[in-house]
């Protein structure tokens, strides 16, 4: 497998979003990492309806908590890039590396402040004035496509 950036989800809430992200990652041959606990079970019918036959266990890694996630990332010397509406740097002006892990927060909350302090960089997707945020699956697709494009992987 070609080395590519990874997508990580912090305690995802919505099964349909997580399933759509898994499909996107599967279609682009990108590893997805899920930091538990999730707000749903993997056998949830809403999850299964969207993920269909795109669930490849070799491409998904689960972490029991964020401490385990950050320990392994530090050991593997991977940069963790947090996508957040609280950042000031636009994703399009950032230089992604193929060894990056791009982290997305929970749909209902994002990530706690302690996570903001642990990441290497924080980026945002600029939005139209007075809009809060994009759907999580859309945000992953936009950011992942840019990361792959910059690294000439699509």
Predicted segments with their positions:
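RNA substrate-binding interface of SAM-dependent RNA methyltransferases
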Residues: 1-85, 148-149
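Hydrophobic/aromatic ligand-binding patch that stacks against planar heteroaromatic rings
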Residues: 24, 114-115
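Short glycine-rich anion-binding loops that position phosphate/pyrophosphate groups of nucleotides
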Residues: 85-89, 106-109, 129
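Active-site oxyanion/phosphate-handling segment shared across diverse enzymes
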Residues: 91-99
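Ser/Thr/Gly-rich flexible loops in soluble cytosolic domains mediating phosphotransfer, phosphorylation
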Residues: 106-114, 133-136
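Structured adenosyl-cofactor binding patch, chiefly the S-adenosyl-L-methionine
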Residues: 118-154
């Amino acid at each position: 497998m070609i080395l590519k950036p990874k997508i990580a989800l912090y305690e995802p809430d919505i099964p349909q979003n997580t399933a759509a992200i898994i499909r996107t990652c599967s279609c682009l041959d990108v590893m997805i990492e899920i930091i538990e606990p999730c707000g749903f079970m993997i056998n949830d019918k809403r999850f299964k309806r969207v993920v269909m036959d795109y669930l490849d266990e070799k491409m998904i890694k689960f972490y029991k908590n964020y401490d385990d996630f950050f320990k392994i990332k530090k050991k593997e010397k991977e940069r963790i890039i947090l996508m957040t509406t609280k950042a000031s740097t636009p994703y399009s002006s950032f230089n992604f590396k193929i060894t990056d892990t791009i982290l997305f927060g929970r749909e209902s909350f994002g990530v706690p402040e302690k996570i903001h302090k642990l990441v290497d960089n924080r980026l945002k997707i600029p939005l139209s004035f007075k809009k809060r945020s994009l759907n999580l699956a859309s945000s992953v697709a936009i950011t992942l496509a840019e990361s792959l494009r910059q690294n000439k992987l699509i």
